[in-house]
Amino acid sequence: MSSATVAATDNRTRCDAIRHWLTPHRLHCIVLAAYVIVVGTVMCFHEPWFDEAQAWLIARDCSWREMILERPHYEGHPPLWWMMLAAPAKLGVPYEIGLKSINLTCATLMIWLLEFKTKLPEPFKVILPFSYFLCYQYGVTSRPMR
């Protein structure tokens, strides 16, 4: 068998595996894609508030030691959000791009877990991602949750 035939067979096998996985999960993939589109679009028009900027400034200006040991006492919530924002903030990524991209990644992961890893009834899995809290409060606003 030539290497071209083996490569074509490998590609066909991969495509069959993807098609086999996608068939029962088609609705969940559509819901996830729609969620990312809706939240991404609304994020473009959302103006961050002072508390969203506060987290970015803490991530940008504090040392790791201060971020983990000192700031939680004053801010009242755990430092995980600042730690996730620290890499783009300290690398000089623009404020809104860095903040919103990290938040969109977290929100997408949340909906992926909801769609593919929970045993909720199908109607809940379709409707729940577009509820006020999951779509706007947790998806669009970039605030640490207490």
Regions found by a protein language model. Give the residues of each.
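Transmembrane-helix motifs of polytopic, lipid-linked glycan transferases
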Residues: 29, 101-126
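Short hydrophobic/aromatic helix or loop-helix immediately within or flanking a transmembrane segment
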Residues: 56-59, 67, 71-101, 105
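Membrane-interfacial loop-to-transmembrane-helix junctions in polytopic alpha-helical membrane proteins
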Residues: 20-23, 27, 91-98, 140-143
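Transmembrane helix-loop junctions in multipass membrane proteins, especially transporters and channels
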Residues: 44-51, 55, 90, 94, ...
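Coil-to-alpha-helix initiation sites in intrinsically disordered, low-complexity, charged segments
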Residues: 10-17, 63, 78-82
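Transmembrane signal-anchor helices characteristic of membrane glycosylation enzymes that use polyprenol
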Residues: 24-52
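Aromatic- and kink-enriched transmembrane "portal" helix at the membrane-lumen/periplasm boundary
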Residues: 39-45, 82, 96, 107-113, ...
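Short, intrinsically disordered terminal tails adjacent to the first/last structured region
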Residues: 1-25
